[in-house]
Curated annotation (Swiss-Prot):
GO terms, molecular function: cysteine-type endopeptidase inhibitor activity; cysteine-type peptidase activity
Cystine pairs: 91-101, 114-134
Protein name: Cystatin-like 1
Any Gene Ontology CC annotation: extracellular region
Localization of this protein: Secreted
Keyword set, alphabetical order: Disulfide bond, Glycoprotein, Protease inhibitor, Secreted, Signal, Thiol protease inhibitor
Organism: Homo sapiens (Human)
Coiled coil: none
Length: 145
């Protein structure tokens, strides 16, 4: 296939269409700094904190204090990398009404900064926590607290 193949207009058209399509998909490589919709944000963060509390051995439950950053990547679903600040509440693990728990007072205050990779297919309400890492807030840089 030398230079002569480009004389065929059909081959030229196919090559142009393929390069345009490949260029379109290359723009979506990697994670993008995009805002989540409020609905997706709430459901993703609720899933995260429930997963964290279920895996934690702490006496008190945590709740999300603040979303610091979110990034997304489209795959077969949506992958989110979320960085959040979470804090101890006054509710203990066995409390049933934990949806509106107030944060601990200064004496027992404990805050963590967590970065998590969450895979979701929000259209079927499916969530999976793929990776999570948390540090105490005082050990993290000021811009993340």
């Amino acid at each position: 296939m030398g230079i002569g193949c480009w004389r065929n207009p059909l081959l030229l058209l196919i090559a142009l269409v393929l390069s345009a399509k490949l260029g379109h998909f290359q723009r979506w490589e990697g994670f993008q700094q995009k805002l989540m919709s409020k609905k997706n944000m709430n459901s993703t963060l609720n899933f995260f904190i429930q997963s964290y509390n279920n895996a934690s051995n702490d006496t008190y439950l945590y709740r999300v204090q603040r979303l610091i950053r979110s990034q997304m990547q489209l795959t077969t679903g949506v992958e989110y990398i979320v960085t959040v600040k979470i804090g101890w509440t006054k509710c203990k693990r066995n409390d049933t009404s934990n949806s509106s728990c107030p944060l601990q007072s200064k004496k027992l205050r404990k805050s963590l900064i967590c970065e998590s990779l969450i895979y979701t297919m929000p259209w079927i309400n499916y969530f999976q926590l793929w990776n999570n890492s948390c540090l105490e807030a005082e050990h993290v840089g000021r811009n993340l607290r």
